Curated annotation (Swiss-Prot):
It catalyses: [ThiI sulfur-carrier protein]-S-sulfanyl-L-cysteine + a uridine in tRNA + 2 reduced [2Fe-2S]-[ferredoxin] + ATP + H(+) = [ThiI sulfur-carrier protein]-L-cysteine + a 4-thiouridine in tRNA + 2 oxidized [2Fe-2S]-[ferredoxin] + AMP + diphosphate; [ThiS sulfur-carrier protein]-C-terminal Gly-Gly-AMP + S-sulfanyl-L-cysteinyl-[cysteine desulfurase] + AH2 = [ThiS sulfur-carrier protein]-C-terminal-Gly-aminoethanethioate + L-cysteinyl-[cysteine desulfurase] + A + AMP + 2 H(+). This is Probable tRNA sulfurtransferase. The keyword RNA-binding applies. Gene3D superfamilies: 3.30.2130.30, HUPs (3.40.50.620). Pathway: Cofactor biosynthesis; thiamine diphosphate biosynthesis.
Length: 392
């Protein structure tokens, strides 16, 4: 008998011929989350399990698994040999349930048997173990439809696994980072963009980030804030993040000098898209923003459409329909909210017009841009760009 952590994964099991690639990714990510000294991870037909060397490892592994996208749930389980008889199974199970003896629980036994050569079928195991449990815990009752406690028995080629709902914890779900392509996140110091990046990590995308810095208008504290946000995202990506910081000051100064005030934000955003597209080359497949429909005056569908026209790359806006309260809840959960609330504004906030355009037309924006030295400004922003490799 051995103690293991049994790991369940969800959507990966639906991926057909590519399934092994998804499984390899989730195994790699579990190892990265645990760090040095990660135990062997074995596969068993829709499950993974970690071998436990000492009891002190359990809480460490549990915390690590809570940060791995693709993990639907996990449980501390007993792994027994398939040659085990009913009496030995009873001994292990009852010993495990003793900690709940004082409670009056409604329970059920739920057996999954993939090894058809096992001498008892699922129904027989359920009935026999259920009867034995009632003998040991007479205050308990069987309830198949609405149990307070479910005892799971999984009979697999690799062994017989026993665990309960008391041993089980939910995971993040989603897909393992690394299977969903690569994206470049436009990361500001606000609440929304880090959450947008996190939601794409949850869909398996490998992300890096770009932050548009307008020194001296936005100071070092604003930059440090964004670096700290990127560092939080690395703890979910489980890898370093490349943070590109183009020089954006001259672009904003030039736009604000040469273009109508109402168009400033839209033209700034179009410059951001052009610069981000230059950064992607063959490395990234998409841009990601934290834009949210109607949240601020510049984020109307008309303005978003005009901003899109500055690039040929797809732009993912995963928060486009979210309520602000829902975004804040995620930000609190993932650890970015307090950082985002630091009182240092980004370049968009500092250069915002008093009366921004809310229904922009491409012709009017192109007219406003026609005297701008677009290529010169973009090239200078990239030449003076700083790139930081942010590690957790």
């Amino acid at each position: 008998m051995k103690k293991v952590i049994l790991i369940k994964y969800g959507e990966i099991a639906l991926k057909g011929k590519n399934r092994h690639l998804f499984e390899s990714s989730i195994i790699e990510n579990i190892r990265l989350a645990i760090g040095e000294g990660a135990p062997p991870i074995e596969q068993c037909r829709g499950r993974l399990y970690l071998q436990l060397t000492t009891e002190k490892d359990i809480s460490c592994y549990r915390e690590a698994l809570k940060r791995v996208f693709g993990v639907v749930g996990f449980a501390l389980a007993y792994r027994l040999n398939l040659e085990i008889n009913l009496e030995e199974m009873e001994e292990v199970l009852i010993k495990h349930l003793r900690k709940l003896e004082s409670k009056s629980l409604a329970f059920r036994v739920d057996t999954r048997r993939t090894v058809k050569s096992f001498p008892m079928d699922s129904m027989e195991i359920n009935k026999k173990l259920g009867a034995l449990i009632l003998q040991h815990f007479p205050k308990w009752q069987v309830n198949l439809n609405n149990p307070e406690l479910t005892i799971f028995i999984e009979v697999r080629d690799e062994g017989l696994f026993i665990y309960t709902t008391e041993d089980h914890e939910d995971g993040l779900g989603g897909l393992p980072v690394g299977v969903g392509g690569r994206g470049l996140l436009l990361l500001s110091g606000g609440i929304d963009s880090p959450v947008a990046g996190w939601t794409l990590l949850k869909r398996g995308m490998m992300i890096d980030a770009v932050y548009f810095h307008s020194f001296p208008y936005t100071g070092e504290k604003a930059k440090e804030k964004v670096i700290d946000l990127a560092r939080v995202l690395t703890s979910w990506k489980l890898r370093a993040i490349n943070l590109h910081i183009p020089y954006f000051t001259k672009i904003q100064e030039t736009v604000n000098k040469m273009c109508p005030e109402s168009t400033w934000t839209i033209i700034h955003r179009r410059f951001m898209m052009r610069i981000a597209e230059k950064l992607t080359k063959s490395t990234y497949h998409t841009l990601i923003t934290g834009e949210n429909l109607g949240q601020v005056a510049s984020q109307t569908i008309q303005n978003i459409a005009v901003i899109n026209q500055a690039t040929n790359l797809p732009i993912l806006r995963p928060l486009i329909s979210f309520d602000k309260n829902d975004i804040i809840k995620i930000a609190e959960k993932i650890g970015t909210f307090r950082i985002s609330k630091r009182p240092y504004e980004d370049c968009c906030a500092l250069f915002a017009p008093k009366n921004p355009e809310t229904k922009a037309k491409e012709e009017a924006i192109l007219k406003a841009e026609e005297n701008l030295p677009l290529n010169e400004l973009i090239n200078e922003a990239l030449e003076k760009m700083e790139t930081l490799r942010i590690k957790n």
